[in-house]
């Protein structure tokens, strides 16, 4: 639920390495 400051419209979340995931075109951490 916390924005990771990254979008995932065209590419996956680079921040997924720290647990962020793509939700509604934005990367979120829980």
Swiss-Prot record:
Give the keywords, sorted: Disulfide bond, Knottin, Plant defense
Translocase as UniProt keyword: no
State the InterPro entries in the record: Cyclotide, Cyclotide_bracelet_CS, Cyclotide_sf
Q: Which GO terms describe its biological process?
A: defense response
| Pfam families xrefs | Cyclotide
Q: How is it modified after translation?
A: Contains 3 disulfide bonds.
At the top level, the lineage of the source is Eukaryota
Q: Where is this cross-link: Cyclopeptide (Gly-Asp)?
A: 1-30
Q: Listed disulfide bonds for this chain? A: 4-20, 8-22, 13-27
Q: Which protein family is it in?
A: Belongs to the cyclotide family. Bracelet subfamily.
Reproduce the free-text note on domains from the UniProt record: The presence of a 'disulfide through disulfide knot' structurally defines this protein as a knottin.
Q: What does this protein do?
A: Probably participates in a plant defense mechanism.
**Protein name, entry field:** Cyclotide cter-F
Originating organism = Clitoria ternatea (Butterfly pea)
Q: What is the lineage of its organism?
A: Eukaryota, Viridiplantae, Streptophyta, Embryophyta, Tracheophyta
């Amino acid at each position: 639920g916390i924005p990771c400051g990254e979008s995932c419209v065209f590419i996956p979340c680079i921040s997924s390495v720290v647990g962020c995931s793509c939700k509604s075109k934005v990367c979120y951490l829980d």
